Amino acid sequence: MRELSVKCRQNGLVFSVDNYVKDGIKNAAKSVSSDKLIAAVPFYTRLWLETPKTDAELASEEGTEAANYKNKVSSTALGMDEAQQVVQDAGAQTEWDDTTKQNYAQWETEDGTYKIWLEDTKSLEEKLKLIKSDNLAGVAEWKLGWENSDVWDMILQYVN
């Protein structure tokens, strides 16, 4: 799964529209007709924390792929409303990233640098537009209960 890859741990995304949704649909459609294909969308976001590696950690990783990254990265999964609250509590401002089609925020604390690409109704709508334009059979969501109250009316606008 993408979120477990080293690249994702550096980039912080769960499922961006630009490549993972478009490419996922395109690749799946090579094996399954669109009228039988269901695309999944996330109702969660990951809050990423980057902390600088110590000199000892960098030395121990020398010669490995991990040595290419100067920060340790950890993450926590958050539901849509909880993620919005974390951003608000941090006093951070979100801005729309047109490449990933997600709202993004970043802030610093004594713990390190926090980064979050929000899954919200706006980012979800971008994914649903692709699902509808590719005439897919439907949409699946993960994880039920982590969505905010606005998503279901929007989903009904895009899914048969």
Language-model region placement:
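Chitinase-like catalytic core of GlcNAc-active glycosidases
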Residues: 1-23, 30, 158
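Extracytoplasmic/secreted envelope proteins and their assembly/folding machinery
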Residues: 1-5, 25, 121-128, 136, ...
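Aromatic-rich peripheral "rim/lid" segments of glycoside hydrolase catalytic domains that contact
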Residues: 99, 130-133, 144-160
